[in-house]
Every structure is written in C-alpha cells, then in structure tokens.
Amino acid sequence: MQRRTIVRTASGALLIAATAGGVLYGCASAPADRADGQRAEAMLKSSFKAHGQATLDRLDQDETQRLCSEYAGRALPQPVAERIEKANLATIRFPADGKLVGDWKSGEKIAQSGRGFQYSDDPTKPAGANCYACHQLSPQELSYGTIGPSLYQFGKRRGFTDETRRYAWQKIYNAQAFNACSNMPRFGHRHILTDAQIRDVVALLVDPASPVNR
C-alpha cells in the first residue's frame, strides 16, 4: 500500500506525494506523520525544476501552509484554527485612499480569467482570479465550480453596506482570516491580485448594477 502525504505549497496548491507505508491520516503516529511529511517535502523539492516564473521558492511553506498540511485529512483543532485565522487577519491591508469598490465590468473579466503565475504565462501581464472555477457568480455564466459557495446575489443578500464592502475586500485579500485552511487563494497577501484588481472584484460582488446582484 502507498502512503499519501499532502503538502500545501507557497502558491496555495495542494501537492500529494506517495511514499511507502499505510494511509497518512488514520492510525499513524504523529512522529511518523512528521517524518513522512519531511520525506515527501524533500522528494518534491528534488523532483521539481524551476521553469520561468515558476521558481522553487513556491515549495517553501509559511506557517499557515505548514499547519494546514500537517492537519490535511483530519479535523483541524479549534485552537489551531483560531491561531491561523488570527495570524492571517493581521496581514490584511486596506488601500491607502480607502476606496474599496472599483468597476464591476473589469471585475467580471478578472473573475473569468485563470491566467497567471504558470511558467507559460507572461509575468508582465496581470493575473486573473479564476473565481468561476469554484463559485457561481453571474447567472449568465453557466460553467462554474462548486467547491466554494454560490456568490450569486452576494450584495443583495448581505446588504449594500460599508460592512459588506469591507468584508468582501478582506475575504478576497486573505480568506484564511475567516476560514482556516480554506482552498481559496490569498489574493492580496500573496500578491496575486493588485489593489485595483481587488477593488474590481469587490465591485462585481457588491455593486447593485452588477449581474451578480440582478
């Protein structure tokens, strides 16, 4: 039988490495789990090669990723979840000019785009957020994922308030502040999206004129 070790990379992706032994999460002891994780990490680092903008530092984990990898496939203890959320909440930064809402039409384009950070992508061009891969947003788009909750009528359901706009900004900037070990990328914290792009995605969610709220 093979043992599967799950490692969350710096880019937020989950990598699964197979090693000899049983199932990682289950009856295995904590020291054995750590040893397997260390072997898997070493194997990943030795097998990956830098290619363009996809450099090896993407395999380096921060504290949040390390903890999420450690508890992958197991219930996350409440104290650990609170520790992760508190640490990530502290990373959130609001724009200096205080403007949180941009252009929802640009936000729709960003939500549709999955480009960015792959070795074959042009690093000089802005990345997309690929929101539709996990969420329903505009009803006009029939192809969407269901890993995340539906965001259709996000603003209408929550209210077109400053509180809703601030929450949307924070959630996009760093989702781990609200849901420890979320699969959602930390778009602001990891510099995937610019402040201007985050404004536009916020607008897609909270602008009454956006198709999301029609």
Language-model segment annotations:
Residues 117-120, 140-144, 211:
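Secretory-pathway/luminal and periplasmic proteins that interact with or process carbohydrate-rich
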Residues 95-96, 120, 187-190:
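Generic anion/oxyanion-binding catalytic loop in active/binding sites
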